[in-house]
Amino acid sequence: MDHFDYKGGRLHAEDVDMAEIAAAVGTPCYVYSTATLTRHFQLFDEALSGMDHLVCFAMKSLSNLAILKLLGDLGAGMDVVSGGEYARARAAGIPGDRIVFSGVGKTREEMAEALSGGIRQFNIESEPELRTLSEVADRLGATAPIALRVNPDVDARTHEKIATGRKTDKFGVPIKRAREIYALAASLPGIEVVGIDVHIGSQLTSLEPFEQAYLKVAELTHQLRADGHDIRRLDLGGGLGIPYTRCNEAPPLPAEYGALIRRTVGELGCEIEIEPGRLIAGNAGILLTKLLYVKEESDRRWLIVDGAMNDLIRPAMYGAHHDIVPLNETQAGVELQEADVVGPVCESGDTFARARPMPPLAEGDLLAFRSAGAYAAVMASEYNSRPLVPEVLVRGDQFAVIRARPTIDEMLGRDRLPGWL
């Protein structure tokens, strides 16, 4: 469900005509729906109702301060994977005790900053990281609450680049070594064992891999408690997928996911943490672009838009599909014609769609790339010296720019010429 719909033949974000945003902000730009973000968070919160739980938004998917504050005001915690994300969460008003710190490469400086801010939990990914955190905490006279991220060797059946729970992936420690490393953690100064963490991948469209992983976590919980560890939290990660095309079979709903959690680990009496990102943000955003040129040869047609791979890298990086629709609603019965939708960047990889059936379009028409709320703006770059795309948040009939497009002078101003040139 999202709140981008045609009204009177024009695509709207909630109650705002998208053309109005394009006129005020320019294109390309990202547009997010407050109503969609709110509803998607609430679906997860409701799915775990009656259980002690915290929904920690995976802010690597979308980290604008306005979005973080919106979700934080709804009661969300945050899952961060860098010192920069931690700083963003705190700047958005998220208290330390609602932040979990994940990631395989935490630095000593990041650990110290999070400890000083009363971090809820570190998700530890390796034995060397555990020893380093112990040293940092002991030096500060602090206690670091930790959950060990276990790798259950489960195939998430997702894209190769976003699978994280196989033994060949860089994440976590083999579940067979977990008891050994928990024993080490209990012996180290400055470390408090509070739970277990697991995360097997992103964009999962079946509950079966989750079930395999969570049953292994349940078994490990019993073993660790028998070993004397106070396992009171289970961080079950995120990864539930979204439909990137309306023709696809819909992935499981949060309610079904919540039922699985109750069935697999609900009797353990643990507080449950989950880290959804894509399902909260993915369909809550679109990339708004303008058609620059229609290029036609005898056997091929290209639609060249002003958005590019530096703005939305997912098609180039993952071969990802995004529905692309005109702001003016296509009438029933209109003949579609195949076209490649491409951007201005000087690479053949700057292609959003190949042989995509598209309605008749003219230069200057506006197009919306759907399902562009997650892993989109956060992965943008200034490749080809193109300014970062602005972000816009809509609420009802209002909209506001929540990240401005930098000027060329601002981009150039970050460079420095050494005096010897």
Segments from the language model and where they lie:
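A charged N-terminal "starter" segment
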Residues: 1-144, 183, 188-192, 219-222, ...
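Charged (often Lys/Glu-rich) extended helix/loop segments that serve as interaction or gating elements
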Residues: 260, 267-421
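Conserved, mostly hydrophobic/aromatic
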Residues: 37, 60, 82, 114, ...
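Active-site-proximal loop/turn and secondary-structure-junction residues that shape catalytic pockets
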Residues: 59-63, 84-85, 105-106, 126-128, ...
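Conserved beta-strand positions in the central sheet of alpha/beta enzyme cores
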Residues: 79-80, 123, 147, 197, ...
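Active-site loop/helix belt of alpha/beta enzymes
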Residues: 152-294, 358-361, 384-386, 395
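Short acidic, glycine/serine/threonine-rich loops at helix termini
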Residues: 68, 91, 111-116, 133-136, ...
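Hydrophobic "anchor" residues on beta-strands that sit immediately upstream
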Residues: 56, 145, 233, 271, ...
